Amino acid sequence: MNIRRAHEKDIPRLIELLEQVLQIHADIRPDIFIPGTTKYTNEELAEMIKDDTKPIYVAADDDDICMGYAFCQIRQQPFSNNMVPFTSLFIDDLCVDAKTRGQHIGEQLFEYVKNEAKHLGCYEVTLNVWSGNTSAEKFYEKMGLKTKERQMEYILM
């Protein structure tokens, strides 16, 4: 397996994997997510691939087929004046193809992202997990992540 930055040729495969992630979220929150859609379009992915502040890392097999990805964003913190300034690498989305889960691809991808964050001078790696996505929560806890903050909601409908 080779972990590298995404290329434009990866876009069709990224779309397939984005569909898998969307379905997980739609199963958890059908009131918010629309099945059969994706978070990004082909055009948006093409722009993101060129943007060094939004690196997309892919785990490719020996045939250079993308088996998983990590969409990342470099963010400057803080959100307010009462915090020390620092750089954070936010994982916007991480996915491993359902057919290849359990082969430690996600672990290798996450370790790669952590090393990239160190190389970029980041203080931390952060991400969000939807409540109800217990397999993702368990995976990230296994990788050493701890809850930083919780966002709560009250649905009015």
State each model region's role:
Residues N2-L17:
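A short beta-loop-alpha structural element at the N-terminal edge
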Residues K118-N128:
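Conserved GNAT acetyl-CoA-binding A-motif
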Residues Q23-L45:
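Conserved GNAT-fold acetyl-CoA-binding loop/helix
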Residues V58, I65-Q73, C95:
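Conserved beta-strand in the GNAT
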Residues T126-A136, E153-M157:
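Conserved beta-strand-loop-alpha-helix junction that forms the acyl-donor binding cleft
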Residues D93-V96, G102-N115, K142:
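Conserved acetyl-CoA-binding loop-helix of GNAT-fold acetyltransferases
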Residues E43-V58:
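A short helix-loop-beta-strand connector motif used in the catalytic cores of GNAT acetyltransferases and
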Residues E107, E111, H119, S131-E149:
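Conserved active-site alpha-helix within GNAT-family acetyltransferase domains
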